[in-house]
Amino acid sequence: MVEQTADILRQGLATGRWRGELPGEHHLSELLQVSRSTLRAALAILHREGAFRVTRGRRRQLAPLNIPTALPRSTTVAVVSSLPLHEHSASSILTFHELRRRLQASGFELQFHSLPQTIKAADRRRLESLVEPDSAACWVLSSCSIGVQRWFMQRGLPTLVLGSCHQGLDLPCFQLDAAAACRHALGVLHRHGHRHIGLLLPNSPFAGSVETEASLRQTCLALSASERMEPIVRHHSGGVAGVEQVTAALLRLPSPPTALIVMMPRDALTVLCHLLLHRWRVPDDISLVSLFDDTFMENASPALARYRCDHSTYARRLARQVIEFAKSGATPRSISVLPDFFPGATIGRPEGVAQVSPPNGSPSDRQTVAAAAV
């Protein structure tokens, strides 16, 4: 265990995870999930190797030889995902295609790996063989569980999360800010008079779902006492049948929601079809908002209210960050991309409710999503 911990620390130093000085022992012990005695034994090995110097009253100062630019770097960028490429959304596939094209133009190749998201013994062995030394200049994690994100973080591998990073983990991320979009959507619906608002999320182990639900609940709590409401949050098992089952159960409630916020665009389309099939008028009987966009949504009628961004610009920004990371090894800063609100034709007022002004702190549909990101 001591030698394994020393190897993880060496990888972190080699990839530039720490600059100038090492974090304190408490932080490293929590980060690597090892005891203080194991950590100190591993640090003693690195000290003998000259990785850092110890000065009384100061943290361990890293030696100049640990400059990552002095190390040979791989020309591979590896994407690790819970899904095979063909099961990703159309917009995600376009993003990966553009990323591959731009990486190739910069002298890198893109490799795509789909892996189980449970970290069992067999999965650990597969991951260990995948990340052998110099196998990739950097790793991009897409739709990965907290176990997989923690595994990469603990080994100090040069890692960028495409999406949200799980709470308590210290990895840079590049994401569309779904939490800000959710807060904005709540404000828009609230302004239209909705007080029974439902949120449909996939029952998944991914950080984006957790952040989105938390943002909705926090925004509801931040409303004034007279305006406060309890959101109706439901998780579905995925697929058309799973989404329809949860939607039907919501509509059978004694006080069904007058508006639904749906996280994933394919699920929003399923909800829209289910509502129309069962003769719910959208938006007269119920309003509907999707927190993400996809190419097929251009063909939906009525036009779905949703949050979208220019996918070419998004892919270009992602590629620029990944290429710089792969070339330099320097840990990039996290980037949250704010989508634009497209009102579509699926938001209306509940029957018998007049248009109202938004409560204090609640963004209206005339405000940008940036107002909800603050």
Protein language model regions, located:
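Amphipathic helical "hinge" segments at domain boundaries
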Residues: 1-11, 15-17, 25, 49, ...
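Hydrophobic alpha-helical segments within soluble ligand-binding/sensing domains
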Residues: 5, 172-199, 240-248, 268, ...
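An alpha-beta-alpha
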Residues: 185-224, 333-348
